[in-house]
């Protein structure tokens, strides 16, 4: 389900030019509108001071497509979590993650998530609808505006399964790249894996990074953690991943949330290494971030390092990603569209 109200945000320069011409305005107004939407982050047409006042007054209620910040919190590590209110009143979460040289935005692609992964707060809260491309782009503009600095990287790792909303996600990638100026190689699309969808994404020939959430080294455990895995075996998922690499020439990142005593045993690391043998890939290990809705535990440092060492011994490229924003419930797996 999508909200279908026409908005200006999400339109290309050509589309905006056509729109202003239909309004009886000269062609160059399209370029001005594009600049105010994507460079200046205009929230209403009334802000666009280069437009004639009489035209601005006529269009004062025309929807641009910007959200409003319903709630904002800052973690001790400077990560900022936002609850954004969409045009229809639904709430999504977005996270801004700053470092000295980067500003990364973790964007949502759906309101909620239907995948119901057992360790993830978003999946526990149910699913309402897909986001439109402009609602994804708006998240980046909102964070950019709040930090008063340019966003350098975007990860589709917020609420939702991006490949279920593939058309709008791909459209948003093109807008972020062509209209806002973020390089495609600075964009990451995450997925738990869906039949046919990885290959469909590959045929768009984007230069983004694909991050595949494995979270288990064998099929029975993966089905326990990710219910949708019942319809997509590890064998078929990895076959599609290999085909993705062949089509795009891009290395895949495999995400693996470490759950203490569940999927972090040395023999499971060996099993994972055997799965990925000969793969053009990198493994990101993510120590579990606790949520109230699940009883899993974060492994200790010894368990984490042992898992890393086993993978390295088997020639698997691996790193540990400690999530930012943990204290603000803004870390990986904690997004639930609520203030807690």
From Swiss-Prot:
Residues involved in [4Fe-4S] cluster binding: 113, 117, 120
Cofactor(s) needed: [4Fe-4S] cluster
Keywords in alphabetical order: 4Fe-4S, Cytoplasm, Disulfide bond, Iron, Iron-sulfur, Metal-binding, Methyltransferase, rRNA processing, S-adenosyl-L-methionine, Transferase, tRNA processing
Cofactor binding remark: Binds 1 [4Fe-4S] cluster. The cluster is coordinated with 3 cysteines and an exchangeable S-adenosyl-L-methionine.
Gene Ontology cellular component terms for the protein in this record: cytoplasm
Comment field (misc): Reaction proceeds by a ping-pong mechanism involving intermediate methylation of a conserved cysteine residue.
Function comment: Specifically methylates position 2 of adenine 2503 in 23S rRNA and position 2 of adenine 37 in tRNAs.
Protein name per the record: Probable dual-specificity RNA methyltransferase RlmN
Species lineage: Bacteria, Bacillati, Cyanobacteriota, Cyanophyceae, Oscillatoriophycideae
Name of the coding gene: rlmN
């Amino acid at each position: 389900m999508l909200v279908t109200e026409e908005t200006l945000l999400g339109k290309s320069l050509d589309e905006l030019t056509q729109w202003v011409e239909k309004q009886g305005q000269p062609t160059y107004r399209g370029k001005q509108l594009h600049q105010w939407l994507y460079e200046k982050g205009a929230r209403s047409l009334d802000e666009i001071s280069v437009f004639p006042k009489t035209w601005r007054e006529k269009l004062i209620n025309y929807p641009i497509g910007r959200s409003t910040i319903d709630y904002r919190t800052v973690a001790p590590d400077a990560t900022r979590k936002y609850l954004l209110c969409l045009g229809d009143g639904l709430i999504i979460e977005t996270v801004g993650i700053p470092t000295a040289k980067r500003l990364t935005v973790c964007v949502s692609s759906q309101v909620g998530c239907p995948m119901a992964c057992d360790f993830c707060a978003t999946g526990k809260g149910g699913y309402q609808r897909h986001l439109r491309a402009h609602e994804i782009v708006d998240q980046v503009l909102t964070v950019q505006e709040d930090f008063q600095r340019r966003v350098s990287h975007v990860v589709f790792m917020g609420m939702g399964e991006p490949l279920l909303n593939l058309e709008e996600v791909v459209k948003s990638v093109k807008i972020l790249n062509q209209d806002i100026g973020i390089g495609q190689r600075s964009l990451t699309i995450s997925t738990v894996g869906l039949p046919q969808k990885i290959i469909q994404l590959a045929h768009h020939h984007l230069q983004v990074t694909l991050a595949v959430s494995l979270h288990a080294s064998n099929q029975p455990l993966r089905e326990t953690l990710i219910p949708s895995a019942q319809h997509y075996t590890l064998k078929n998922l990895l076959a599609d991943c290999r085909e993705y690499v062949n089509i795009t020439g891009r290395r895949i990142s495999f995400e693996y949330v470490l759950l203490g005593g569940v999927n972090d045993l040395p023999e499971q690391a060996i099993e994972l290494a055997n799965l990925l043998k000969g793969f053009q890939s990198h493994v990101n290990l993510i120590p579990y971030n606790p949520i109230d809705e699940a009883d899993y535990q974060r492994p200790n440092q010894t368990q984490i390092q042992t898992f890393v060492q086993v993978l390295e011994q088997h020639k698997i490229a691996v790193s540990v990603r400690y999530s930012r924003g943990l204290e603000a419930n803004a870390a990986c797996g904690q997004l639930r569209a609520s203030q807690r």
